[in-house]
UniProtKB/Swiss-Prot annotation:
Protein name in the entry: Nucleoid-associated protein Acry_1999
HAMAP family according to UniProt: DNA_YbaB_EbfC (MF_00274)
Family membership noted in the UniProt record: Belongs to the YbaB/EbfC family.
Pfam families in UniProt: YbaB_DNA_bd (PF02575)
Functional summary from the UniProt entry: Binds to DNA and alters its conformation. May be involved in regulation of gene expression, nucleoid organization and DNA protection.
TM segment ranges: none
Alphabetized InterPro entries for the sequence: YbaB-like_sf, YbaB/EbfC
NCBIfam families the UniProt entry points to: DNA_YbaB_EbfC
Primary site of residence: cytoplasm
Species for this entry: Acidiphilium cryptum (strain JF-5)
Disulfide bonds: none
Length: 107
């Protein structure tokens, strides 16, 4: 019974640590780039787009498709960086313990 109480306490501490990590992530802004930095997208830690910067040299009414592709690529880059950062933070909180597929904390 004592071991069960200890496990429950550890689980509660991990849950609190994960909530703190989630709060830290939500406060962050992550930037992705494309076209050698000519298009930049900023996402919140929740993955919501906060801003976009486009170098004026790219604005060509005759070639909107290239600009559209670069915006998508910059967003994809920012999203990838966010996912990597979230995974790194999760490793810190869980001490490298992998959770079963589909299991998310807090419970």
């Amino acid at each position: 019974m004592k071991n069960l109480a200890g496990l429950m306490k550890q689980a509660q501490q991990m849950q609190q640590n994960m909530q703190e990590m989630q709060t830290r992530l939500e406060a962050m802004e992550i930037r992705g780039e494309a076209g050698a930095g000519l298009v930049k997208v900023t996402l919140s830690g929740k993955g919501e787009m906060k801003g976009i910067e486009i170098d004026p040299k790219l604005i060509d009414p005759n070639d909107a498709e290239m600009l559209q592709d670069l915006i998508v690529a910059a967003h994809r880059d920012a999203k990838s960086r966010l996912e990597t950062l979230a995974a790194e933070e999760m490793q810190k909180v869980t001490g490298g313990i992998s959770l079963p597929p589909g299991m998310k904390l807090p419970f």
